[in-house]
């Protein structure tokens, strides 16, 4: 039996997909984002579920993720958001992976590689409409197209960009990005090019229906978290991930007992301390030392002392029914209580995305359809 494990609720994933689909503007389709092991939720099982739900495309960040999806039998069009390196191009073409292109030298190499394979490489061009990160500046798009369209083994299927702050209440920046993206799409249309346009992430899908174009790219909302708490039109989402462990020891302690490294917590009165075999090695943030909480027998118990590499301690004095080997929920629901990724993220000064990715590295992961497996 594992000391800790992650449970993934595929029924919740399907529910969240349906909420995304309900928000789609007419004519738009879903491109499901499964990069970074589906935000820690398990890329291949999640991808299979999204295929069954009717997604039209999938997106990953890295080439090897796309190759793994193909090896798992996923035939849906797959977009590689970071593009592919020259050493990966032949494999990408053979696997019909769609690289995102933002460098003309890579486009040339890709075309040459495709010609050598007697094939065509299908690509999407990335525009920087204001995020300042990855992509061709809009003012350079026409010159980029002038060369790209001369490459004999390249098929331009799509153009994409990415919102920098669609998850904020103030949509000024997003509106400017949207204007620039529309202008780019108009330029393509004027040249007789019919391509797929996509810019909407989860926040764009929820709050900016005018940004849906041909595809929308939900990511975090598929996994049950809102992109932020500032959205004008939040959705009814269900968390997909639960993180569990168990009590491996219960200890009665006297007043004045230091707990954990450095004795940063000292008991003020006699009580009971539960030791739980989870630590920062398992993705449980050290920043939750003396700040976090876990669920035991449907009740909240504060984390006391420092989070160490493989263990934490919780004060269960107020839960007299607690027993050794009892299930502990570190993320998710137990009874009527719930610890959310947003709560953990706020305590750690980060975002839910990072919490999911960290916890999702746990090697013991099970998948269920609304009724969790026993461990």
Swiss-Prot record:
One of its GO terms (biological process) is D-alanine biosynthetic process. The modification N6-(pyridoxal phosphate)lysine is found at residue 35. One of its GO terms (molecular function) is pyridoxal phosphate binding. Pathway: Amino-acid biosynthesis; D-alanine biosynthesis; D-alanine from L-alanine: step 1/1. It catalyses: L-alanine = D-alanine. The active site is at residues 35, 261. Pfam families: Ala_racemase_C, Ala_racemase_N. Its EC number is 5.1.1.1. GO terms for cellular component: cytosol. Keywords: Isomerase, Pyridoxal phosphate. PROSITE patterns: ALANINE_RACEMASE. Catalyzes the interconversion of L-alanine and D-alanine. May also act on other amino acids. PANTHER family: ALANINE RACEMASE, ALANINE RACEMASE, CATABOLIC-RELATED. This is Alanine racemase. It comes from Syntrophobacter fumaroxidans (strain DSM 10017 / MPOB).
